[in-house]
UniProtKB/Swiss-Prot annotation:
SMART domains: RING, ZnF_C3H1
PROSITE patterns: ZF_C3H1, ZF_RING_2
Residues in C3H1-type zinc fingers: 98-126
Assembly mode: Associated with the spliceosome.
Name of the protein in its database record: Pre-mRNA-splicing factor CWC24
Keyword vocabulary terms for this entry: DNA-binding, Metal-binding, mRNA processing, mRNA splicing, Nucleus, Spliceosome, Zinc, Zinc-finger
Entry-linked InterPro entries: CWC24-like, Znf-RING_euk, Znf_CCCH, Znf_CCCH_sf, Znf_RING, Znf_RING/FYVE/PHD
Pfam families assigned: zf-CCCH, zf-RING_UBOX
Region described as Disordered: 19-38, 43-68
Main localization category: nucleus
Name of the coding gene: CWC24
Length: 216
């Protein structure tokens, strides 16, 4: 439980004191050498610090390799804004710009719009009037003739192209024969595309000459 006391010899203590004195005598010499080494290191650092800024701006880009030059060109091209890359030869792009965004395209192409008078776009057919010769457009005919001209679109509403073997349904609307049969047989829709009345599959052929005369 209790620690034993160790009696130290006086000789050991004297030797330690002698060693400490010798170390203290050698210490100033080591301090002097350390100071000298520090001074030399500081002088070297100052020299290097003076030389480095002179050498840094003198590194021209011409000494860089071709790969580095190519990389610099790529970075400079990316930094430029508003420049487009050349298109690939195997890619073709078509751009369609709408110069009349306020005009109803369905009414302009076919002469019919499903929204009718509630459509928020303009119902204008100026371009279609230029294609078809107009005779005495300023004269106003009978009200019945005007109604007939307004009801008949100048193109098929289903395929949006010129009439091919046109037919008339029971409700009085005109379509292409192939378009009407495709809608009636394949899609199994027996109602009229314009007025949504039942047609029962009945259709009457219409003469193209008479149809072109009644169109606007």
């Amino acid at each position: 439980m209790f620690k034993k006391r160790v009696i130290k010899d006086s000789r050991v203590s004297k030797r330690k004191i002698g060693d400490i004195n010798e170390a203290s005598e050698d210490a100033p010499d080591t301090q002097v050498t350390k100071k000298s080494t520090l001074i030399t290191k500081k002088s070297d650092i100052q020299k290097k610090s003076v030389v480095m800024p002179r050498s840094s701006p003198q590194t021209p880009l011409s000494k860089s390799s071709s790969d580095d030059a190519a990389a610099v060109e790529v970075v400079s091209q990316k930094s430029k804004k508003g420049e487009l890359k050349p298109l690939a030869a195997n890619i073709k792009t078509t751009i369609i710009t709408d110069f009349q965004p306020d005009v109803c395209k369905d009414f302009q192409q076919t002469g019919y719009c499903g929204y009718g008078d509630t459509c928020k776009f303009l119902h204008v057919r100026d371009e279609s009037r230029q294609k078809i010769p107009i005779k005495k457009d300023w004269e106003i005919g009978g009200q019945k003739e005007v109604k007939e001209k307004e009801d008949i679109p100048f193109k098929c509403v289903l395929c949006k192209s010129d009439y091919k073997s046109p037919i008339k349904t029971e409700c009085g609307h005109i379509f292409c024969k192939a378009c009407f049969l495709d809608r009636y047989k394949a899609k199994k829709k027996g109602t009229c595309f314009i007025c949504h009345k039942e047609t029962n599959g009945t259709m009457v052929p219409v003469n193209i000459d008479k149809l072109s005369a009644t169109q606007v």
